[in-house]
Amino acid sequence: MARIVVLISGSGSNLQALIDAQKQGQLGEDAHIVSVISSSKKAYGLTRAADNNIPTKVCSLYPYTKGIAKEDKAARAKARSQFENDLAKLVLEEKPDVIICAGWLLILGSTFLSQLQSVPILNLHPALPGCFDGTTHAIEMAWRKCQDENKPLTAGCMVHYVIEEVDKGEPLVVKKLEIIPGEETLEQYEQRVHDAEHIAIVEATYKVLQQLHK
């Protein structure tokens, strides 16, 4: 069985795409989501997982940094490292073949990545390679750039391998979308991106699992 661990922070719409794909055999015959780990106990994605009998865990950064002043960078870095170490332990307990960051909003640093070197980690980013790296506002930034420059813009989303440099890992699946000035609202473009993300995350998961089993 191919074991998938999914990391989330919010509504879990991309998690739902993976759950639906698993039911339809689109991730591979033996692929199963064995755990969903959320950085927020309020994430609706936890409900989605529970509704589909997928075990869940919560690993929030807040308890680690609570009470530490933002100016105390050394203490915050130490707390962050402890958080990543504990997160890595939770993930490793599941013996994953692949880890999918599906709307996971926290940067995975060296403490986490060094313990998961043998496991491919994928991240969904709502922009093309080299565009709007390291921001959670990539969709709005692309749409506004198109409107401000008043000319068509090719944007989209990608699924890439996670490395220490944020959003700089090798792209696995890229979906391009054309934005035309004045043709759609930000909300309409955002929906197009999300629709493309749901396809991309399934394709990327299937692709990496097929490569692992060659």
From Swiss-Prot:
SUPFAM superfamilies: Formyltransferase
Catalysed reaction equations from the record: N(1)-(5-phospho-beta-D-ribosyl)glycinamide + (6R)-10-formyltetrahydrofolate = N(2)-formyl-N(1)-(5-phospho-beta-D-ribosyl)glycinamide + (6S)-5,6,7,8-tetrahydrofolate + H(+)
Similarity annotation: Belongs to the GART family.
PROSITE patterns assigned: GART
InterPro entries: Formyl_transf_N (IPR002376), Formyl_transf_N_sf (IPR036477), GART (IPR004607), GART_AS (IPR001555)
Underlying gene: ADE8
Site annotation Raises pKa of active site His: residues: 167
Protein name per its UniProtKB record: Phosphoribosylglycinamide formyltransferase
Keyword Transferase (UniProt): yes
Top-level taxon of origin: Eukaryota
GO biological process per UniProt: 'de novo' IMP biosynthetic process; adenine biosynthetic process; purine nucleotide biosynthetic process
Disulfide pairings: none
Binding sites annotated in the UniProt record for (6R)-10-formyltetrahydrofolate: 105-108, 123, 167
